[in-house]
Design a protein with these regions (language model features):
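Active-site region of glycoside hydrolase catalytic domains
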Residues: 1-98, 122-123, 141-143, 149-384
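Alpha-helical scaffolding within the catalytic cores
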Residues: 51, 113-117
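A common structural microfeature
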Residues: 62-64, 111, 128
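Active-site mouth loops of central-metabolism enzymes
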Residues: 99-113
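Short, well-structured secondary-structure segments
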Residues: 127-134, 168-172
Length: 384
């Protein structure tokens, strides 16, 4: 148990049990290490848990093997053939935004290397290839006022080359590189972007849909909403309203996704026979101490505010009760007249719910959760 640690006195504790030295009764509370140690004794060692055991076998014969890219990450050709500026063009050209002031002006030069890229995919023997369309390459100002046919031709050549190699294209409509012209009128904060995104999706479905069976509306909306508009660590680099703007942007992303899904479902699905969904990203979260309820609760909040932020409206309808309650209560406690989380109308809830054909999910890591007291700070991190 914790004890008098010589020169450190009672400032540190190495024991299996915590001792409250401020209490005259000196109560003992088992730490996680005590539970772990008792399990080691019980097992007389360290048997490998089932979830750590190697699995052997074969995937189904129709299992999809794929690789994935994003337009700004690989294409280059940032001003080629009439392409408009994107928010990542501006962001990466701003000093000190990207390490070494690197940018995607040329990147992998995939705009000029379609045949070479497809040859590499053939060597990998993949069955599918996921890539994204650069919105500003086909619609330089983000609207259908001017359609850049040269940009569309690039994607026609890529899709045709993939199909000739017996590789199915899987197209993402939006992978973060919003046309700068739309950002100039507040981008995803401005509700008009919902119609602009629908118009853009309509163009792509009409031009490429007869060749493409797999679609993603928006890739990783969490990153767009919070990394780009809360932390400001990615384009468009906005960080001065972290308690409100991410939720406004997320709200419009969900409505834009729903409109694109319904457009495909109502106008194109019967003829083109494809499938379409949103792709959500999220870390998983485990309690730092699985025997402490506050850590268990913190882990649940992380998941609800990460994957649940976007999955709950799409799959279940509306934001989760946990998310709505926490943000509302913290907003009111800070003296605000209402919740910082926008509300969906009953019609919008119905419109968004069920807008999926599959569960698109990107997962990279797992984090340990524990409560942190942010006081009345109005911020996404404090909310969760």
């Amino acid at each position: 148990m914790d004890s008098f640690e010589w020169l450190q006195g009672y400032t540190i504790g190495f024991g299996l049990h915590h001792v409250d030295f401020t209490n005259p009764n000196r109560p003992r509370t088992p730490k996680y290490s005590a539970h772990f140690f008792s399990q080691v004794v019980k097992n007389n060692g360290f048997p490998k848990p089932d979830d750590d055991k190697m699995l052997y076998g074969h995937f189904r014969k129709d299992f999809i093997w794929s690789t994935a890219t994003a337009s700004y990450q690989i294409e280059g050709g940032w001003r080629a053939d009439g392409k408009g500026l994107s928010i990542w063009d501006k962001f990466a050209h701003t000093p000190l935004r990207v390490l070494n002031d690197d940018d995607g002006d040329v990147a992998c030069d995939s705009y000029n290397k379609v045949e070479e890229d497809v040859a590499m995919l053939r060597q990998l023997k993949v069955t599918h290839y996921r890539f994204s369309i650069s919105w500003s390459r086909v619609l330089p100002d983000g609207t259908t006022r001017h359609i850049n046919e040269a940009g569309l031709n690039f994607y026609h050549r890529l899709v045709d080359a993939l199909l000739a190699a017996n590789i199915q294209p899987h197209i993402t409509l939006f992978h973060w590189d919003l046309p700068q012209a739309l950002q100039d009128i507040k981008g995803w904060e401005n509700e008009t972007i919902i119609d602009r995104f629908r118009d853009y999706a309509d163009l792509i479905f009409s031009r490429l849909g007869h060749k493409v069976k797999f679609w993603i509306t928006i890739n990783e909306p969490y990153n767009v909403a919070n990394i780009g508009h809360g932390y400001g660590a990615a384009a468009p680099g906005i960080s001065f309203r972290p308690g409100t703007l991410p939720y406004i942007v997320g709200h419009n992303l969900l409505k834009a996704h729903a409109e694109a899904w319904h457009l495909y479902n109502d106008k194109y699905r019967a003829k083109q026979k494809g499938i379409i969904s949103i792709t959500i990203n999220s870390d998983w979260s485990e309690p730092r101490n699985p025997y402490k309820q506050v850590d268990i609760d913190a882990a649940k909040r992380v998941v609800q505010f990460y994957i649940g932020w976007f999955a709950h409206p799409v799959f279940n309808g509306d934001y989760s009760n946990m998310m709505k309650t926490i943000i509302r209560e913290r907003s009111l406690a800070a003296g605000l007249p209402k919740s910082r989380l926008p509300e969906f109308s009953p019609e919008e809830i119905k419109r968004i719910k069920g807008t999926y054909d599959y569960f698109g999910f990107n997962h990279y890591t797992t984090v340990l959760a524990f409560p942190v007291d942010y006081g009345n700070l109005q911020h996404y991190d404090a909310d969760r």
